[in-house]
Amino acid sequence: RDYYLALAAIYSGNLETARDLLQGVKMRSGTMPAEYADLLIDALEDPARKNEIAGMVVNATKTGELDKLVGFESLLIIGSPRAFDLGIDPVSDVKNLQLHAQIWNNSAVEFRQDPRFKEWVEELGYDDFWRKYGWPDRCRPTGPNNFECI
């Protein structure tokens, strides 16, 4: 419950409350270590530090200090396309469907605009689904075999 409240606090701009709620919270993918909760809020408070902090999260997952899916979800919270650097397979690695939903949050615009996002969409089959049943608000076709998302 605290995780969802922390996300609500982030989306409403109440970052100090979010900082408190994220400390050691159980996320969709695992537990958020307190020091990384602080870093994520630091990145949201100071966007100039976002890429630096994203790099710290990526490095922590590569050394095993931070679980890969926790790192991935953390990078989604700050909207960093560096989440792709973790080599997460959207089909075999991401079992929690709610984690898939997080890619559509307002904070994930940069993530969706990264060229690697198209590969994800295609691997998941979303593009074929959208062509058949209609496009979501955040994506649109740009040609017979191409699309963009915001």
Placement of each model-derived feature along the sequence:
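Alpha-helical protein-protein interaction modules
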Residues: 1-150
